């Protein structure tokens, strides 16, 4: 592993650097589901007994900052992907809390040079402290050669 | 026919092809809903001025299409995890096709893994990903 990547991992991984609360409005989760093409009533009908936000709704929630303060700028950042893990349904009409940390930092070297990837993870909890879901944002920074 | 239980899933089977609505109207409504109302998602000409080939479908909307496809195949499926890679822009108003294939079936815990791809009319992969899905044991 490159020395600067190892140092960044030591300094930044697995330390919460942001906390934010999010209201989950039912009309917004229903519209989100509709635009995605969902047809299941549990995502579209607020009267359904198992009414819930669509699983990837949390991917649309952003913390106050994507990377920790003083994180090295390896290059221009671009959105390289999203991941979601679901443990319990996110219920519309509730307020949830998201805590963000850097989950991974790694590099790949190709023909155009080195690319550094940073994975920010937001862990979402309900008011009772139950861990509902994780949302990962993968940013790729291409270094200038 | 919709899948109801894990016993109905066959390793290697293709999910029914899903044609998402990648119109500019949908992309634009979605971008505004999540607070990303910039021209790159709402206006072809504005996106071109930013150096893009046209307005894009937001990446997380593509992820939403993939999950909707799984729910069309198996309405009671619970998404346990989905990871998506945004390989290239999905341009709004261009036709795209989503395909999926079952790459693992665990009849004991009811979980399946599905590889998913969003491709344009040239057959170029724009987004790909993997989902882990929980199905009823039956």
What is each of the regions a protein language model found here?
Chain B
Residues 1-55:
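Catalytic strand-loop segment that frames the active site of acyl-thioester-processing enzymes
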Residues 1-15, 89-138:
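HotDog/MaoC-like acyl-thioester-processing domains
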């Amino acid at each position: 592993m490159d020395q600067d990547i190892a140092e960044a991992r030591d300094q930044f991984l697995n330390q919460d650097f942001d906390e934010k609360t999010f209201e989950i409005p039912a009309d917004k989760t229903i519209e989100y589901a509709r635009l995605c093409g969902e047809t299941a009533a549990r995502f579209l009908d607020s009267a359904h007994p198992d009414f819930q936000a669509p699983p990837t709704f949390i991917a649309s929630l952003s913390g106050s900052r994507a990377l920790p303060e003083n994180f090295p700028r390896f290059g221009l950042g671009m959105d390289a992907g999203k991941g979601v893990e679901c443990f319990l349904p996110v219920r519309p009409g509730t307020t949830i809390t998201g805590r963000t940390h850097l989950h991974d930092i790694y590099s790949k070297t190709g023909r155009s040079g080195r690319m550094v990837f940073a994975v920010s993870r937001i862990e979402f909890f309900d008011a009772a402290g139950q861990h509902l879901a994780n949302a990962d944002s993968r940013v790729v920074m291409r270094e200038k050669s | 026919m919709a899948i109801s239980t894990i016993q109905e899933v066959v390793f290697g089977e293709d999910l029914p092809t899903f044609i998402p609505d990648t119109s500019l109207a949908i992309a634009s409504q979605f971008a505004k809903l999540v607070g990303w109302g910039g021209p790159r998602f709402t206006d072809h000409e504005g996106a071109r001025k930013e150096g893009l080939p046209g307005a894009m479908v937001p990446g997380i909307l593509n992820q939403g299409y993939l999950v909707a496809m799984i729910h069309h195949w198996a309405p009671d499926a619970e998404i346990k995890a989905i990871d998506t890679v945004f390989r290239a822009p999905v341009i709004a108003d261009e036709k795209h096709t989503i395909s999926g294939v079952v790459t693992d079936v665990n009849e004991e815990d009811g979980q399946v893994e599905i590889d998913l791809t969003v491709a344009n009319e040239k057959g170029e992969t724009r987004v790909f990903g993997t989902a882990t899905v929980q199905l009823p044991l039956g």
